[in-house]
Amino acid sequence: CGAERSLSSVLFLVALIFVVGTTAGVISAYAGGIVDIVIMRIADMMISFPGIILAIAISGIMGPSLINAMLALTVVTWTKYARLSRSLVLKLKESEFVEAAIVSGGTHTHILLHHILPNVLPLLVITAAADIGAMMMELAGLSFLGFGSQPPQPEWGLMLNEGRLQLQTAPWLMFFPGFAIFLSVVVFNLWGDALRDVLDPHQDQQ
């Protein structure tokens, strides 16, 4: 029915974007200097293009496949996490407990793993959870347009594309994949809100 491939693909996609973007942002903020300038200029360049249009262009160049569609979406989406993680790390670098760790002779690895990342990850995880629904829509959209999954792979976006050819005679071929996407997006959005309330309970109060 396409559920396993669709759900596992979008979860892997969000995890990939999370890792790439967060790593780039943390390195940019912590290293500073020319490294920060280069990474942020690349991010600014990527943001200047419409995301889905750029993803379609990259998928078209690389060739239609689910893996290439996921890589294309990663290329155009990592900047969000890079900029967010960078801003969080820059604030933490000026905090007293990080300065104390530096003065006490803590290594860069120790400071990153024990002082910076534990304070950065909760907000980034909330952001990632909230993005799952949007990424599902974009990945299904690429498959629907022919740039994602290819037959005979069962994936909801591809099933929508194939079902539209039988819309007059068998409308359920489009209804059920579409409803599955809709339901999954709603569930993931609600889950993201619940996760935000757990990891950041002061958000609503603010």
List the predicted regions and their residue ranges:
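Alpha-helical transmembrane segments of integral membrane proteins
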Residues: 1-206
